[in-house]
């Protein structure tokens, strides 16, 4: 009979042949508590093994190779039990042969169920057997201890050697395994739950990052979450925790997305697409933020340039203020000087300053005395210069007044000449002419006293500068009509003044004689009534239509009488201002309407070359107009690029009237008479409209001029020929 290998005593086979004694090993010393615990562990292990035999299919496959060997060992053990069953306790008895350690193991299924874990937690890890093999060994040893006092036939027991230590020797790997199983029993569920919780938190984090939990379409994801955590029993959870972690992750993914859940896959694809779009939006936002950052950095560098610009602007503003202050001071000085000059000014009845406080000759003498003595004040020198300039301007004004009086005298002479031809003359016309002749003689005398030679006065008188009619000039002076009555009362007393009083300053004398002439304009207006009757007719000669051309002709004729250049009269045409036609649009339309209004015949647009040939033909008749033919007044201001007259900007009859006025001025300068060019308008209009239109127009003019309803009592003398108005 074999004994326990860890017992103190050894069983020896006794026989007649005196077989050799085989030592089976020392008998383990175990206390009753350890034996009870091991017995309970063995019973519970067997019970749990039977209960979990159906669930641990994976473990049975792992022990299939060992089960065949263990069946042979069990059969041998059962045979030994039958031989050694004399003790009556149903324990295993050793056979005639020594049972190997590998054949003594029985298949015991280990499990980490809750009952086993609770039992193992109550037992100290050092007292727990490391495996079912150890449990079987303890069971054998305990059965051997029970049979120590029983005599077995053919066997005898002897005392073996004592072990080196009082405590049983437990292998290190067995102890570590026991400790690990104890710890696993305590923390197995908590670690698995922590692992599952970490997976759940990871999934929730992914869902939160993608934003799917914030959307209303959460049906498929909720189903997936329900599938991730199915309600299974504790045994299934424990079995799953024993598997590989990779298998659990794959199982989790397979359970969360089943193969037949197509809508869930579509929703996941939709979520992935949306996530990609959101990532793209995030990249765009990052690019915008980067651009804004760069812009802010550039704006941070700009204040330096702005500060420099502000400094320049401040400097410019300061300079402007300084210049403004200087100009204000200069203006104050000019105002003070002007007030001083006005204080010394002697004003006439009409409010015009007649004397500025001294004669220019006195100023020259004062200036010479200042040079002889000491240097005068620069302000005084400047004042003297201004006075000299004013004196020069006054001389020019006086010259213009002389020219005006000469033109009036010439008009009166022509009126008297026309009256001698049979026209009724006004009773006071001869007296007015005599008074004007006397005035001119007085002015000539004053011209001699002021340094003008009598020859100059006579030459000027012979040239007879032609200006606007007395009626037209009287229209300019209507605003002074309130003072004419007062001046008329003093006409005769002033005429009889002594020669000493006439020797006053040339400025005062000129003003006085000008005033005398203005007083007599009321009488001279009657002589120009014939021109007024012509102006009332809208179809009369274009040159007599308005006052603008005659007024401008007089303005431009002043100061031009002594000029030898006859082409200056052409240049005056460019300075005229013409009234544009009304009620038409376009060159052709305006030309047609003008012809119908003037002659009752449509006028074709005038061409520059045609008009130039007409002018050359007419000027060739005049012996003194050779210079005028060299440069005709056909500037681009009157003709377009195509050579067509600009009928839409000015009327053609106004342009012809201006040409006639210029020719009259040249005729006055060259011959002293402008009657030579009286037929200029008829010549030009006869070329463009025909002689029939001119005859028709002349008959209308005669009929209109002899109509008693049009001609007033003072306008009877206006029935005389047309050339009277050329003056």
From Swiss-Prot:
Residues 473-563 have a biased composition (Basic and acidic residues). GO terms for biological process: articular cartilage development; cell adhesion; cell migration; extracellular matrix disassembly; gene expression; gene expression involved in extracellular matrix organization; hemopoiesis; positive regulation of chondrocyte proliferation. The modification Phosphothreonine is found at residue 148. GO terms for molecular function: DNA-binding transcription factor binding; transcription coactivator activity; transcription corepressor activity. Residues 1-169, 446-565, 694-727 are annotated as: Disordered. A motif (Nuclear localization signal) lies at residues 486-506, 691-716. Residues 694-703 have a biased composition (Basic residues). Its main location: cytoplasm. Residues 1-10, 446-456 have a biased composition (Polar residues). Residues 270-350, 377-405 form a coiled coil. Interacts with ESR1, PBX1, PBX2 and PBX3. Interacts with TEX11. This is Pre-B-cell leukemia transcription factor-interacting protein 1. It comes from Mus musculus (Mouse). The gene is Pbxip1.
């Amino acid at each position: 009979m074999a004994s326990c290998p860890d017992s103190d005593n050894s069983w020896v086979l006794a026989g007649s042949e005196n077989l050799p004694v085989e030592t089976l090993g020392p008998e383990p010393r175990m206390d009753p508590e350890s034996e009870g615990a091991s017995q309970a562990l063995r019973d519970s292990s067997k019970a749990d093994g039977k209960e979990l035999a159906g669930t641990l299919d994976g473990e049975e496959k792992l022990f299939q190779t060992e089960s065949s060997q263990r069946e042979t060992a069990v059969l041998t053990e059962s045979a030994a039990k039958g031989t050694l069953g004399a003790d009556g306790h149903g324990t295993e008895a050793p056979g005639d042969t020594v049972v190997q350690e590998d054949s003594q193991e029985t298949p015991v299924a280990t499990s980490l169920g809750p009952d086993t874990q609770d039992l193992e937690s109550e037992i100290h890890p050092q007292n727990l057997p490391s495996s079912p093999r150890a449990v079987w060994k303890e069971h054998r040893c305990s059965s051997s201890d029970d049979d120590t006092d029983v005599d077995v036939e053919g066997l005898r027991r002897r005392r073996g050697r004592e072990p080196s230590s009082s405590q049983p020797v437990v292998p290190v790997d067995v102890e570590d395994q026991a400790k690990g199983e104890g710890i696993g029993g305590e923390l197995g569920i908590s670690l698995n739950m922590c692992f599952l919780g970490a997976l759940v938190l990871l999934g929730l984090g992914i869902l939160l990052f993608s934003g799917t939990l914030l959307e209303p379409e959460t049906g498929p994801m909720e189903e997936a979450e329900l599938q991730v955590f199915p309600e299974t029993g504790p045994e299934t959870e424990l079995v799953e925790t024993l598997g590989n972690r990779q298998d659990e992750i794959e199982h989790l993914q397979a359970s969360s997305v089943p193969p037949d859940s197509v809508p869930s896959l579509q929703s996941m694809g939709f979520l992935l697409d949306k996530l990609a779009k959101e990532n793209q939006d995030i990249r765009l936002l990052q690019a915008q933020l980067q651009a804004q950052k760069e812009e802010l950095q550039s704006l941070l560098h700009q204040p330096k340039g702005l500060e420099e610009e502000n400094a320049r602007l401040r400097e410019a503003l300061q300079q402007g203020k300084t210049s403004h202050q200087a100009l204000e001071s200069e203006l104050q000085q000019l105002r003070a000087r002007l007030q001083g000059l006005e204080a010394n000014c002697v004003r006439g009845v009409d409010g015009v300053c007649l004397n500025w406080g001294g004669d220019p000759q006195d100023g020259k003498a004062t200036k010479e005395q200042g040079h002889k003595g000491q240097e005068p004040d620069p302000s005084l020198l400047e004042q003297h210069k201004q006075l000299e300039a004013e004196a020069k301007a006054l001389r020019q004004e006086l010259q213009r007044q002389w020219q005006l009086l000469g033109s009036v005298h010439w008009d009166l002479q022509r009126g008297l000449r026309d009256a001698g031809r049979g026209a009724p003359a006004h009773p006071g016309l001869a007296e007015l002419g005599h008074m004007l002749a006397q005035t001119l003689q007085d002015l000539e005398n004053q011209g001699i006293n002021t340094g003008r030679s009598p020859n100059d006065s006579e030459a000027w008188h012979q040239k007879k500068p032609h200006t606007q009619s007395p009626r037209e000039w009287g229209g300019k002076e209507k605003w002074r009509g309130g003072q004419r009555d007062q001046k008329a009362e003093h006409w005769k007393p002033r005429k009889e003044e002594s020669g000493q009083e006439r020797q006053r300053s040339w400025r005062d004398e000129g003003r006085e004689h000008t005033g005398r002439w203005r007083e007599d304009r009321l009488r001279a207006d009657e002589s120009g009534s014939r021109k007024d009757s012509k102006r009332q007719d809208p179809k009369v000669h274009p040159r007599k239509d308005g006052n603008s051309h005659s007024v401008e002709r007089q303005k431009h004729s002043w100061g031009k009488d002594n000029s030898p250049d006859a082409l200056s009269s052409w240049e005056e045409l460019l300075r005229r201002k013409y009234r544009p036609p009304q009620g038409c649009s376009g060159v052709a339309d305006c030309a047609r309407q003008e012809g119908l209004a003037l002659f009752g015949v449509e006028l074709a647009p005038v061409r520059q070359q045609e008009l130039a040939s007409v002018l050359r033909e007419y000027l060739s008749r005049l012996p003194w107009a050779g210079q005028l033919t060299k440069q005709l007044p056909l500037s681009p201001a009157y003709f377009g690029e195509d050579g067509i007259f600009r009928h839409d900007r000015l009327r053609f009859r106004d342009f012809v009237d201006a040409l006639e006025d210029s020719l009259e001025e040249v005729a006055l300068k060259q011959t002293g008479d402008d009657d030579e060019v009286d037929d200029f308008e008829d010549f030009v209009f006869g070329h463009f409209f025909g002689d029939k239109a001119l005859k028709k127009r002349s008959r209308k003019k005669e009929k209109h001029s002899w109509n008693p309803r049009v001609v007033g009592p003072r306008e009877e003398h206006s029935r005389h020929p047309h050339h009277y108005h050329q003056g």
